[in-house]
């Protein structure tokens, strides 16, 4: 419904878990100076999906100069971390808060945008990519939804803000961002008009740097619904533009690490060169290819990566380590089979992982003494 010319979603979100005392104080400081501060972007989307946001971004109708004056007046430390973009970082209770002035695009070239500072929340929302990324929320949980983002989340569909072709041609990387976010939805619905716009402008990705392509594709490949998302990347012609071979969808399975996912593809080595993998990523890919026909080794590598092992340990000559403790070792130390033994084995395995898989059998057994 529209209240005071602002579209507010009919139900409040539960914002309490992320609203700290520092955020409440910052909000009051802006209000006391006749300005507004809201949570914007991905944090609002994640809360609406019942997820805990990793990062919280804030926006305000105050200009950077006004922000700094407001924070100075309140005795709050701050740093001009991105003045050209209108971003000030306020530091309160030893916690940084990035606050950005509302902006509107004045000029775009398919890769970057020139912006100007504005006072309109709706104008700022217009420059964002997808409807559910264009929402903002106050600390009470009121959602300001100008383009139907909440409805799209409920319908499990991703749509561009306003005209899809305009949003895409402003920054062609938005095509891959679309697929990345679509993959995050549970059993997503595909919007035909959006797919037509992507198909029409897929070639625009040829002007995007390899690093930016991989940055987005790595998130696509480590997300959910990878097979269905890649299938649609192929159907829209995007795969040909970015170098992804076709007919991969049926072979792809969801993986926690993008290199693990990419290793399933026939042209993974060529893609690694084209997308300019880091040295660590290249070493990991070569290792995975070397052990491709050994499912046991593959599983161990996946466990290692999932547990955060330093990728430097995984190189072309590496041997995948075996957990050195068995139930027989614990029985030999006098432990009886049962739940306690299982718990001890799990505890020792966690210690072994914490050592980057270097702790010896004796060291681990001594830890049980």
Task: Describe the role of every protein-language-model region.
Residues 2-369:
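Catalytic cores of the polymerase beta-like nucleotidyltransferase superfamily
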């Amino acid at each position: 419904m529209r209240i005071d010319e602002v579209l507010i979603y009919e139900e409040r979100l539960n914002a309490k878990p992320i609203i700290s005392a520092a955020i409440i104080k910052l909000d009051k400081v802006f209000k006391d100076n006749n300005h507004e501060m809201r949570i914007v972007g991905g944090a609002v989307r994640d809360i609406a999906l019942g997820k805990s946001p990793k990062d919280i971004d804030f926006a305000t109708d105050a200009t950077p100069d006004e922000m700094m004056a407001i924070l100075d007046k309140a005795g709050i430390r701050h740093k001009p971390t991105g003045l050209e973009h209108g971003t000030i970082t306020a530091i309160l209770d030893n916690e940084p808060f990035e606050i950005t002035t509302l902006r509107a695009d004045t000029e775009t070239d398919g890769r970057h945008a020139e912006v100007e500072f504005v006072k309109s929340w709706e104008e700022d929302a217009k420059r964002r990519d997808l409807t559910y990324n264009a929402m903002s929320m106050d600390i009470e949980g009121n959602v300001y939804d100008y383009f139907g983002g909440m409805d799209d989340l409920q319908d499990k569909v991703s749509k561009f803000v306003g005209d899809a072709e305009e949003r895409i041609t402003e920054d062609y990387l938005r095509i891959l961002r679309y697929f990345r976010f679509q993959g995050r939805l549970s059993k997503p619905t595909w919007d035909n008009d959006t797919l037509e716009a992507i198909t029409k402008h897929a070639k625009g990705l040829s002007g995007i740097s390899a690093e930016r392509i991989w940055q987005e594709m790595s998130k696509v490949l480590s997300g959910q619904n990878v097979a269905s998302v890649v299938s649609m990347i192929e159907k829209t012609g995007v795969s040909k533009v970015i170098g992804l071979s076709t007919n991969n969808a049926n072979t792809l399975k969801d993986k926690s690490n993008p290199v693990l996912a990419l290793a399933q593809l026939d042209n993974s080595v060529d893609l690694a060169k084209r997308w300019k993998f880091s040295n660590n990523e290249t070493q990991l890919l070569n290792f995975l290819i070397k052990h491709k026909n050994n499912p046991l080794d593959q599983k161990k590598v996946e466990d290692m990566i999932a547990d955060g092992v330093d990728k430097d340990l995984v190189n072309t000559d590496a041997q995948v380590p075996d957990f050195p403790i068995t139930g027989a070792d614990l029985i030999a130390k006098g432990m009886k089979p049962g739940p306690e033994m299982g718990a001890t084995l799990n505890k020792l395995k966690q210690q072994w992982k914490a050592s980057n898989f270097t702790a010896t059998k004796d060291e681990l057994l001594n830890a049980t003494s």
